Structure formats: C-alpha cells, structure tokens
Design a protein with these regions (language model features):
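Reverse-transcriptase-like RNA-dependent polymerase core
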Residues: 61, 89-113, 122, 126-135, ...
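A conserved non-catalytic segment of reverse transcriptases
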Residues: 210, 216, 298-373, 384
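Short cysteine-rich loop/turn motifs with clustered Cys
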Residues: 491-519
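Charged boundary/loop elements
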Residues: 8-68, 133-149
C-alpha cells in the first residue's frame, strides 16, 4: 500500500461515524455504572477497547488533537505520518507491558523551580487514550459533584462558583489544603484496588505505573505515584482522591434541630487542590485531622507549610482567584435567604500572584522585543492579554483590568522612548499611539491593515453558570453541553458566536462538539483574509 493511499485512507476515515459509535458505547457504560451494573460495564469496556472506532480516535487524539503531540518519549518519536497513524491504530491492544517514561523538566508558573513530567512513548500514549475512553464514563458516573479538575465539561470556573455559593451568605472558616507531591506519592496497590477493573486492564495500568522513568541515560524505578505527563494520569489521580468529599459531607451533615444546629460542610476539589468550608472553626479543625488520616491510606499527606485555616473575612486564594468578604454599607450589602442585611459583600477577584505573573510576562515580552517592529510586539502581546482577560472575565476584574492597562501603557512608553531617545515625548506618542474613542490606541499598520494592542478593560464581565450537580457529558444531553461550551470564558467570542449559530454542531461532519473536540475556524471560500462571519465555520 503506497503512502499516498494510506494518507488518503487515514484522512478520509468516516470520523463522524466512528465518534458516534464510540459515544454510544460510552453512554451505555455511563448508564450501567450509574445503576451499579458492574458486569455490563466490564463487558462494554472490553468491547470498546477492542473496537476499531475507539482505536482510531485514541490515535487521533494523541497525534493530531493534543497540544503536547510533538513531545517525544524514550522512543524519540515526535510525530507520525498518516501512514504511521493507521499502522499504530491497527497495533493497539492490551499487552500488560509498557516502556519507561522520559523525564522532562518544565518550569512551574511564576517560580524558579521546575517540576518533572514523565512522557510516555507515542504507542503508550495512544493505548492510554484508548483505555481512558473506556474507563472515563464509568468513573464519571461515580465521581462526586464538587470534583472539577481534569473532568469533561468541568472547569476552574465551576469550582470557584461552588466556593462562592459556599461562603456568600455568612462568615465561614476555610481549610485551604495542599497535598504534598500528590501525583508522585499515590500508593499503587491502593489505587489499583480502588479501580477494581478487569484483570488484563488492571495488569496494563500496573505496567504503566511500574514502568520506571529515564532521566538522561539512567533508569529509575517507580514504586509509587502516577507520572505527570501521561494521558491517563489525571483520571487515575481523580480515582485515587475519589471519596474525599463524601468523607467530609457524611461526617459533618446539616443539623436543623436541637442545640447544635449547623449547616453541612462543603468540600470543593480541583484535582489535588481543595478547600473545606464551614461556619464553625471546630468543624474545620476536625476536618483537617480526618483528611490527614484518610490521605495516609493512599500514601499521601498534607503539606503543613502550605495548609492553613483562614476566615472568609480575611480572604484566601484558590485556583488563581481571591475570595474575600468585604465590609460595606447597608446599601451595598448582600442579604441572606431571609432578606436580612449581612453587612458584607463576597467578591471574587484575580489573585495578586496571578496579576503579578501576567504583568511580568507582558513586561518580559516587551523587553525581549526592544528592537522589533511594533507590529511584531503587538502580535506577541495580544494573545497574552486576551487569554488572561477572558479567563478572569467571570469575576470582579474591572479594577484589575484598568490597573493592568495603566501599567502596560507606562511600560510601552518606556519601550518607545528607548527606541527614540533623541526625539520629544510628543513625537514618540504620535508615532506609536493614535486617539481612538478618546483613548490612546497603541497601533501599527501591516499590509494596509491596522493592528491595535488589545485593552484589558474592554473585556466584558459575564458571571459563569456552574455545571449542574453531578451532570456529565456522557449523559447524552447534547443541547445542555453544547450551550455550556458556548458560554465558556476560555473560548473566544468569535468561536462562541459560531457555536451558537451552528447550534453546537460541527460544520463539516454535523456531529455535536464535545469537551474533547478541538474547534478550528475554517474559511468557507478558502480566502483567509475574508473574516466576515458568514464566511466562517467551526
């Protein structure tokens, strides 16, 4: 078979049909798991793992859709041709074997230290994606409602809304917890026992966990932990930590009668980051002890130096946001469910650390582009501004946006003056800035087209609507899930508008977009300069 033929064959696979087949089985697994029918779950998982449809989708996800697709493991393979993708899909099967992962060190955001990733080979990544396709719907039916990290259809914004609902009506105490080296320390035996899957799959997962890691030319054994960098690792970590919320909510239930009236304790978790919320300090202190005991069974422990108990009046940071109750006048105060004035207002804002980090990123970019054309600098800064502003567009960010715009303006003035040290400030201003709607616009021209620097303050604030309870995309309610995708703060306005116009469906295959979909904007007439809405399609 020639390479041209196999390229054509891979690119022209009936992807719409394959995705529908896979989702139908996933939906059945989710339903069987929801009703506790383990035998049906296992039979359907075997069927899915051996299906050609799932194998093709698994290969596509790790070789085409995944952002880290061009990272090599110990095999040295960074990318695959369509011919090789087809070959890999045909080879995928559960063998109970695994090659070591490759240790790659990446910087921690905003810190000088680095954290290790364990990158599997491209074959192991594809096989892990296949296993995840089968395991995820089973566990989505089991996972607790206030678990939000690395789950389809859930985000940091859902977690923050859950925290807001927990603290908005009364002063609360918060256990702000940090698990020490969570991914690196999880006990393999306890994890595999908790997974409780069929023997051949259990052996395969054990092989991945025990595969070892190559650091340089030296192989290190892995007796504990799940390697960060594996496709299946976040799911395994969620399985390991499943039950933590139930532990707290069962122990500290709502009491509506008697002398010891109290509300229920709330635990909100995003992967290994979590907070416990309650009105009584004693409940929070007991929660900490209870959680420490529970974690010890997994081989984990709380990091004392980073675990603290705080009040909602003093505020706390969680997932890059700051949550705090501010004392305000009666006119601006929140009210409880009885309509009584509380004397405070709970506000969520970007955390100081996150503000500092984005400004440093902008500042360093400007410094690096000291002698570059203005257009090049604008093109480099705009994605940073847009991404950060969109992420924080669901909370009280207006003041922060204005502050960042002011800091950025001052930094750009320094940049411009350094380039023309012998010119007057007025000359520099006219060269690089233009007045637009009464405000200075940092703007340049390229191919007779104006390119302006984005402004933080122009980002519209829209409150995020939290995902409902324990809902999952595997429940098959396409209308609900596609409408949520269109409201996500992490997608651009243009994509959101097209999603709404296309009613959540792909313009090419007609399938509904799901949470794993990579959405790309296509120009209908092939003219990439024609960006009119009617010429764009997702």
């Amino acid at each position: 078979m020639s390479e041209l033929t196999t390229t054509h064959e891979w690119n022209n696979l009936p992807w719409r049909k394959l995705e529908r087949k896979v989702f139908k089985l996933q939906k059945r697994i989710y339903q069987a798991s929801s009703r506790g029918d383990t035998e049906t779950v296992r039979n359907l998982q075997r069927l899915l793992i051996n299906s050609w449809s799932a194998k093709c989708i698994a290969v596509r996800r790790v070789t085409q859709d995944n952002q880290g697709k061009k990272t090599a493991g110990v095999d040295g393979v960074k990318s695959l041709s369509p011919e090789a993708r087809l070959k890999l899909a045909k080879q995928l099967r559960i063998t109970g074997k695994s090659k070591p992962t490759l240790r790659v060190w990446i910087p921690k955001p905003g810190k000088d230290e680095k954290r290790p990733l364990g990158i599997p080979t491209i074959h192991d990544r594809a096989l892990q994606a296949l296993v995840k396709i089968a395991l995820e719907p089973e566990w989505e039916a089991k996972f607790e409602p206030n678990s939000y990290g690395f789950r389809p259809g859930r985000s940091t914004h859902d977690a923050i809304e859950a925290v807001f609902k927990g603290v908005k009506s009364k002063e609360k105490f918060i256990l702000d917890a940090d698990i020490a080296k969570c991914f690196d320390k999880i006990n393999h035996y306890v994890l595999l026992k908790k997974l409780n899957t069929f023997p051949s799959l259990s052996r395969q997962i054990k092989a991945w966990l025990k595969s070892g890691v190559m650091d340089g030319k030296e192989l290190f054994p892995t007796q504990e932990g799940t390697p960060q960098g594996g496709v299946i690792s976040p799911l395994l970590a969620n399985v390991a930590l499943h039950g933590l919320e139930t532990l707290i909510t069962n122990k500290f239930k709502r009491l509506s009668t008697g002398q010891n009236k109290r509300t229920a304790a709330i635990l909100v978790r995003y992967a290994d980051d979590f907070v416990v919320i309650h009105e009584h300090l004693s409940v929070i202190e007991q929660s900490k002890q209870l959680i420490s005991q529970w974690l010890s069974n997994l081989g984990l422990e709380l990091k004392e130096s980073k675990t603290k108990i705080v009040s909602s009046k003093t505020g706390f940071d969680f997932l890059g946001f700051n949550i705090k109750q501010y004392s305000v006048s009666d006119n601006h105060s929140s009210r409880n469910t009885k309509g009584e004035i509380l004397g405070f207002k709970t506000l969520i804002k970007p955390s100081d650390e996150s503000i500092k980090r984005v400004y440093e990123q902008l500042r360093d970019t400007i410094d690096r582009y000291g002698t570059s054309p203005q257009v090049a600098l604008i093109k480099k800064l705009n994605p940073i501004i847009k991404g950060w502003a969109n992420y924080y567009s669901t909370v009280c960010s207006t003041d922060t946006y204005n502050d960042l715009d002011s800091l950025l303006y001052n930094k750009l003035q320094q940049w411009a003056r350094r380039r023309h040290s012998k010119k007057t400030n007025g000359w520099v201003a006219i060269k690089y800035w233009h007045v637009n709607e009464g405000k200075w616009d940092f703007r340049a021209e390229e191919d007779e087209k104006r390119i302006s620097l984005l402004k933080f303050y122009k980002t519209k604030i829209n409150r995020h609507i939290k995902v409902q309870g324990s809902r999952s995309p595997f429940d098959g309610d396409w209308i609900y899930w596609s409408s949520r995708m269109g409201r996500s703060p992490e997608i651009s306005k243009k994509v959101a508008k097209l999603l709404k116009e296309q009613q959540g469906k792909c313009g090419h295959c007609g399938n509904y977009f799901d949470t794993d979909s990579v959405m790309e904007i296509h120009h209908v007439d092939g003219n990439h300069k024609n960006n009119k809405t009617e010429n764009l399609q997702l």
